[in-house]
Swiss-Prot record:
Function: Negatively regulates transcription of bacterial ribonucleotide reductase nrd genes and operons by binding to NrdR-boxes.
Cofactor(s) in the UniProt record: Zn(2+)
NCBIfam families referenced in this protein's UniProt entry, alphabetically: transcriptional regulator NrdR
Cofactor binding, note field: Binds 1 zinc ion.
Signal sequence, renumbered to the chain: none
Key word Secreted present: no
Keyword Protein biosynthesis: no
Xref: Pfam families: ATP-cone, Zn_ribbon_NrdR
Protein name (Swiss-Prot/TrEMBL): Transcriptional repressor NrdR
Lineage start: Bacteria, Pseudomonadati, Pseudomonadota, Alphaproteobacteria, Hyphomicrobiales
Top-level taxon in the UniProt lineage: Bacteria
Residue intervals of every unnamed zinc finger in the record: 3-34
Amino acid sequence: MRCPYCQSEDTQVKDSRPAEDGAVIRRRRVCSVCGGRFTTFERVQLRDLMVVKKSGRRVPFDRDKLTRSIEVALRKRDVDSERVERAISGIVRQLESAGEAEVTSDEIGRLAMDALKGIDDIAYIRFASVYRNFSKAVDFHNVIDELTVSETGDNLET
């Protein structure tokens, strides 16, 4: 594994343990050249997924892009990073175990919103504003109403 600080390939594993309920191996590493310490994660990849964008373009699924999107929504929110990582792993497992070689960007966004709804309301609203392409203040009001209805268990069809 290459050191992220000095790019040396001379690194050693100092600690290795299961994480995320055994779905991931967390390794603590140290660089023999610069002494830098860093953590890596090893996880099973069931299949190579292709994402079908709204434009019809196909690109390889990028777990890191999903992670960055969710982290942007969670910025400055007091949420346990382990909980976020479990949510991201859950989304990826759902996508991989669906048995499809392709998944739409809309499906990924919907799964991310579902996960965020259970983690943090503010992050859910932030993510929704980008995913649903909000253009007016009423769009925010509508998603807040959705959250309020789902939290109280009210049914709009009365």
